[in-house]
Amino acid sequence: MKITWLGHSAFRIETSKSKILLDPFLSHNASFSGQDIKDVSAGITHILLTHGHGDHVGDTVALAKETGAVVLANADLAAWLGSKGVDRIEMGNTGGTVTFGGFSATFTNALHSSAQITEDGVSHALGNANGLMLHFDDEASIFAMGDTDIFSDMALINELHQPDIGFVPIGDRFTMGGAVAALACQRYFSFKTAIPCHYGTFPIIDQTADKFVAGMEGSKTQARAMKPAESLSI
């Protein structure tokens, strides 16, 4: 398995059977600057979305049309994507699992909102925000928390799924901050590796992973703060 952080909450996940983009906010992502969208989207089979905000949906519509990748989203967001011309869509909702060739994705709770703002400035809700629990055939498992605060039922997610790797939002203001995210990882999860995300993109969120890394000191979990475009082989 190869994991590449594309900045913000966008990741590319490559396995022997799948090439996945998670929350592909790319063209307006300052952290993605210098990377090539065609390169990171080459050969993708699936696009996975945690919720409907623009900094997560990002380039999904264009990429889905260009690549033919299957898009996974909650039911309300899936309907919105369909109205934009995306025709290869799998939908689900909190607690549900969708199985693909080579991996499955389970929608978990997340404490956040999910919406798109239309041209007339009105915010339209697009279902609940979710985390995505990804189980791969003969590969490490990944829990992409999405945008969220800490919550005690994270313990149940860990009990049910035992994820090996966590994608953890740490930027504060719109999600939990680094210190709280570290507490969530240490109290509720048994990750082998925790990768911080959702930081450094906009001036109003934390610019570094320092608080998270400091909070993870002494943990059995490796806190791996990656640079945009950096890859990690598992």
Swiss-Prot record:
Coiled-coil stretches are none
* Pfam families cross-referenced by the UniProt entry: Lactamase_B_2 (PF12706)
InterPro entries reported for this sequence: Metallo-B-lactamas, RibonucZ/Hydroxyglut_hydro, UPF0173, UPF0173_UPF0282_UlaG_hydrolase
A single GO molecular-function term is: hydrolase activity
Q: Which UniProt keywords apply?
A: Hydrolase
UniProt key word Hydrolase: yes
Q: Which family does it belong to?
A: Belongs to the UPF0173 family.
PANTHER family named among the record's database cross-references: UPF0173 METAL-DEPENDENT HYDROLASE MJ1163, UPF0173 METAL-DEPENDENT HYDROLASE MJ1163-RELATED
Name of the featured protein? UPF0173 metal-dependent hydrolase RHE_CH01853
